[in-house]
């Protein structure tokens, strides 16, 4: 995705953020023309103690391709709250690469939500350069029909006292396929690292497929690291309970799916509520390409 974006993006949006005053920014990009290409490249530099809340909304339809590359450097004590809401309609495709470097005491919070693309691939790449930084990654992807949703994340700790919280959720239905690979690297220099990684998945169709691989590589000997993965269907006892209260089967299933998704979407910035992400992800609101 990176080389492709660099070869096609004629422009780059560069932002330098300084000062302790929080800044909020929303960027909306739409690719709708048949066989169109939308290359997006964004460069962020957050100086010491700077704070930015960035929401990116990506809309795609027709046989379009959206290519996103974001590169960010967080100075000491800087904070970046970053959301990517990707709403597509097949056969549109999305390729996204998010590369973030963190200095000590910085905080990076990434929340991603995607559905509807024929192919959606997101690649968060996080490097904690000097330790004592915090990273929080929350992802939600939905794949149905013949759609493929892929997330490959990579986090590396270069110094001591770093921390990571990662939760990735996926729903696969129809003949959709969801792929998650989360790599965490803890070299010897990264003592006292505290990292947790969890992949939770719902498989709603016999023809759907889920591949999940949380991955820890630990060399340091003084760490607290854990990972796990679950793949399940909707729980029959929960469905039975709702139906016993007079709720029909379809509505009961939708309620359980809403609850599954809501946990991940709670991490989105407050401004994201204008896009009604839960309703759009579950196709219960306005058309995906319609602006709020």
Q: Which role does the model predict for each range below?
A:
Residues 1-247, 261, 265, 269-292:
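Conserved beta-strand/loop scaffold segments within soluble protein domains that form the structured core
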